[in-house]
Amino acid sequence: MKWPVRVKISVGLARGLAWLHHHNKRFRVFHHNISSKCILLDRNFEPKISNFGDAMFMNLMNGELLELGFDKKDVYSFGVVLIELVTGKETINASANSDRTPFSLRDAVDKSLIGLGFDGEIFEFLSIACKCVQSLPEQRPTMLQVYQTMRATGKKHGIVDDH
């Protein structure tokens, strides 16, 4: 799969999760089972999130439930999917590599992507993935932060369009 398609999938997934987590201040959805197996692609490679069987639908009249970190599980799982998109391989234990930031994962980047003019963006996305799979949930960004960073990176490189 070419890099621009992987970017489209990953940014679309980040946008969808950010919407579920942040669209409505009073009502949030936490998927709790994000993996590459629950991401469906339409004919234009737009990702669709499926498998909401373990999802938590929360009415957040106050912010106390966010302190429990329900959103950070989705961030971690998104990071795993992003690593899979960058490496082209299924990830087993991403947190073991997260503290060593891209250096241990650099060698795992799908070799078919290197040298095609996207190397900077590939390693920026890999860095984002490493932040998402930090072992301590409070060190992980929010999905809105992830989406905004990925979108800005993609736009800077001319790959992401506005939705």
Stretch-by-stretch model annotation:
Residues 18-21, 28, 151-154:
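A structural signal for long alpha-helical coiled-coils and helix-turn connectors
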Residues 18, 25, 87-90:
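A broadly tuned "polar low-complexity/structure-edge" signature
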Residues 13-23, 132:
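Conserved hydrophobic alpha-helix
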